[in-house]
């Protein structure tokens, strides 16, 4: 096989683009083959569609191959995640623009006969919202208000087809960076774009790349992609690796050209087998085409990419722990300095960014820094992907411009809270993030605005909670996760999180006191100030944000000693006449004026007015107030 040249690559791109255009003369059926839809049965839908087409004499083509009668042929592809996970399995048909939701294998015959052959829309398979049918994907509210940059090809292409990626402009940004720009120019373009790391910290990517580039005395440098997505409920990076793996590879290759690195590592948790498979397929195909390896396109630049599977430890999402794991050491954070850009993997200068950050890079190089700056806010350019989960009508993968509000994401895109329930909170940023309230719904979602609220974007997990959620239980869940995932290296995190979890357990069991709330705050201050790594330093954010924003939930446990949400039963407060001395202290402390009576006579609680805040229970010096359970 002859070596690929720049001219050869351009010819490859031209041929692929022409093949893509020819393929569009026939129907293209895209079946979601992301992890979520596969679990819902999309592979059986794929197989049944092919069988039904074959039985009717339709020619099903693979890849971009196309010839013959367009009316008797079509392409059926397995794509990456479409994002609309609540409605999977999903089938998208182009050029009709039709999307079918919750498709079952037994629906395939009707799809072939009525839509693929008859051009008719099957209304029962379309998405419905508020009594309205939405046959076309672009009209569905979930998609209509998104701005897809990183996810543009996820769900729109065959994730394992290199030719299709190249046909849509893939690897042209790498070609441009390789031949038309030097390392300083690439770093400057990334800096000018305002791209900040999408893994949680929001550190400017261009500045990080430039720091590594300046180590000109060091012949060995590394590019590391963090695909160790450990936040509960997060699946943004997984979906990108599954749905558009070549964009991640291309971003890493451009980073290599910018900094002089020749080796790249993608660190992926072993719980993502489909992502690992598709990344490996992408690496193998890129290498076979001459896009990876030695002396790429005759430029003199060499680059190799390897996949390293992690064991799923949350702490390995921290940079120094991740590099230690790749080196074969136990995944534990290291004291800084030195920073990763100076002494990272095997002690060499290392660029470490996450999957979404690298996936943004090809678009920035091709379209320019000004284009990217035009999206988002002044301090947070571009878009951000979010995994929308919890008590929301439409869970799924969402991409919006930085600065979009929580209201737009949860209500306009996500469809709001199901079953007529009220919104209570949203947890953002995973175990290192915080819980926000209804009053925060109109805050812009960007790095700086969230920092002011004591929260972080993190990798992009959004867990929505309704009125039936006890926020103390939420705090306990995240503290249990963090304590269980603590590497144990530093005492503040190892022991401090254990003490916080014990305190939360005591509160949840209605055995706590107001002093426990002070204890939580004191422990949080100590852990935050003294923990070794960023994960430990932010471990208390879920607890502190719930204590600050939902203190009433804590008071139900430590004052009232009863939480109607946790106990699952209704209850009413009652004053025991045999114990009441008629001092009136309970009435004076009641914020709702729900308690009445005469001095030195038993008082009475009006449970229609009572909000069960526990103020009376805490004020009564005689223990005369009791909670009566009601079935």
Regions found by a protein language model. Give the residues of each.
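Ferredoxin-type iron-sulfur electron-transfer modules in oxidoreductases and energy-metabolism complexes
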Residues: 3-27, 43-76, 87-89, 94-127, ...
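Short amphipathic, charge-patterned alpha-helical segments
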Residues: 53, 251-253, 402-418
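Flexible inter-domain linker/hinge segments
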Residues: 126-192, 353-368
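Accessory "access/gating" subregions that flank catalytic or transport cores
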Residues: 175-219, 373-374, 379, 387, ...
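Hydrophobic alpha-helical positions that pack around
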Residues: 276-402, 414
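C-terminal accessory/binding modules appended to enzymatic or scaffolding proteins
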Residues: 380-394, 400, 406, 566-611, ...
